[in-house]
Amino acid sequence: MPLTARLQRRIAWFFFPSLLVVSALVLFTVAKRVHAEPKNGTQTLVFLRHAEKPAMGLGQLNCQGLNRALELSEVLPREFGKADFIFAANPSRHVEEGEGDLSYSYVRPLMTVGPSAIKLGLPVNIDFGANDTSELANELMRDKYHNSIIYTAWSHGYLPELISKVAEEASGKAANLVDDWTGDDFDSVVVVTLKWVDGKATLDYKNHKQGLNNGTEACPKST
């Protein structure tokens, strides 16, 4: 083999590992830049309390609450758009209510959005307990939710805190959008709209009504 060819070959072998390293670094930098690019879009967060409950609590809905839940499967998509994601408070949390303060699994929020989830063909995320407001607020800030409609059914005792924490996470400053959610209010819907541009959100907040008060107190009849 001529000297020049051998020299070229040695030079090539010498620089080949360096070329691989440089190429890998370039690809890593590009991939990291693409991955870190914030997702723009409009995020519509629809917050509602669970439906009506029986006098004894039972962690459960009563027949009027069941009727509301069924009606919500029509009302929510019509008024606020079809959900991409649905959350409900984890039913494994126990509540003490009724005579003797007996402990019951807290299924009310899940049952309230259950018909909507079934109708829309969606799962319900129950990873967060009713008092896990900070954790859920952090979850809702993820890029995957930045251009979506989200229904969240929760406990009225924690809804003001949850809504304020979401607003605080999105805006970066303290927020108090809802002072209180009264014990007799099953009809309110709080909608927080976040418009995301380059990782920053502008916030809009409105209080709506479902228009489902005074619903029938008898359970639906089977056909």
List each model region and its residues.
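Active-site-proximal alpha-helix that buttresses catalytic centers in soluble enzyme cores
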Residues: 34-147, 158-223
